[in-house]
């Protein structure tokens, strides 16, 4: 890697958190931890059985807050990159955990929401949420109190902060996708957007994604190994450029 990059955009999917013990959605059978997606990740599922949906996310939240779930070397490397790069690093994540924050990243866009927040469906106001959400927990920020729900973007709902995402992609000179399947849009199209704006594109995954042909460079292996390796290459290129300019 020869060029020093100034505006790095990272897209992360379930693969980066899987190595930390967070189970992923299995697209081949439509199940998430043995639950049908239609039951636990749609507005209709929440309307049908709010108790079951709330408990599903309560269990995920408890696990995330347990000592068993920790950021892995890939999260830590991205935190280091943001701290040491002489430029900007934007992490766009499809994950709902807080492992990027705990790994040291600060400029994070949670396009699918956050497990450690709850949202009022009437006002869209969000609050920090580390305790269980129960059926009957009402929001009192609006005139008509509504049942609080997990701050999660369910299937059929619009991803969050799309304007900020596209603005970052327009500025990117390096776009890296880590642990994504490439089948969920609009995220699967980000590599095309970044490439059209001139960014170098890299895919890091266990196996080729559905959009692997869009990437100029592919690195296949564990995120915990490949991401730290890439970060060191980026920072080394920056150091060489600084030395040559001195």
UniProtKB/Swiss-Prot annotation:
It catalyses: N(6)-acetyl-L-lysyl-[protein] + NAD(+) + H2O = 2''-O-acetyl-ADP-D-ribose + nicotinamide + L-lysyl-[protein]; N(6)-succinyl-L-lysyl-[protein] + NAD(+) + H2O = 2''-O-succinyl-ADP-D-ribose + nicotinamide + L-lysyl-[protein]. It is an enzyme of class 2 (transferase). Its main location: cytoplasm. Residues 1-237 form the Deacetylase sirtuin-type domain. The keyword Endoplasmic reticulum does not apply. Its cofactor is Zn(2+). Zn(2+) binds at residues 120, 139. It is found in: Cytoplasm. Its EC number is 2.3.1.286. Keywords: Cytoplasm, Metal-binding, NAD, Transferase, Zinc. The keyword Zinc applies. The active site is at residue 112. Transmembrane segments: none annotated. Belongs to the sirtuin family. Class III subfamily. This is NAD-dependent protein deacylase.
């Amino acid at each position: 890697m020869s060029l020093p990059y100034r505006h790095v955009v990272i897209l992360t999917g379930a693969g980066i958190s899987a190595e930390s013990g967070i189970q992923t959605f299995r697209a081949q059978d439509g199940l998430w931890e043995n639950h049908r997606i239609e039951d636990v990740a749609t507005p209709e599922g929440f309307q049908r059985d709010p108790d079951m949906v709330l408990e599903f996310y309560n269990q995920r939240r408890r696990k995330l807050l347990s000592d068993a779930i920790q950021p892995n070397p890939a999260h830590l490397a991205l935190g280091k990159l943001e701290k040491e790069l002489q430029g900007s690093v934007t992490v766009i994540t499809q994950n709902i955990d807080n492992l990027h924050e705990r790994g040291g990243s600060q400029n994070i866009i949670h396009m699918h929401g956050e497990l450690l927040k709850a949202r009022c469906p009437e006002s869209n106001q969000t609050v920090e949420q580390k305790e269980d959400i129960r059926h009957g927990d009402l929001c009192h920020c609006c005139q008509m109190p509504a049942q609080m729900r997990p701050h999660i973007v369910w299937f059929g709902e619009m991803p969050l902060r799309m304007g900020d995402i596209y603005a970052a992609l327009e500025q990117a000179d390096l776009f890296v996708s880590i642990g994504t399947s490439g089948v969920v849009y609009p995220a699967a199209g980000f590599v095309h957007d970044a490439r059209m704006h001139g960014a170098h594109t890299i895919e890091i995954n266990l196996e080729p994604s559905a959009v692997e042909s869009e990437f100029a460079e592919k690195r296949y292996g564990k995120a915990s190994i490949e991401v730290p390796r890439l970060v060191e290459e980026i920072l080394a290129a920056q150091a060489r450029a600084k030395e040559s300019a001195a």
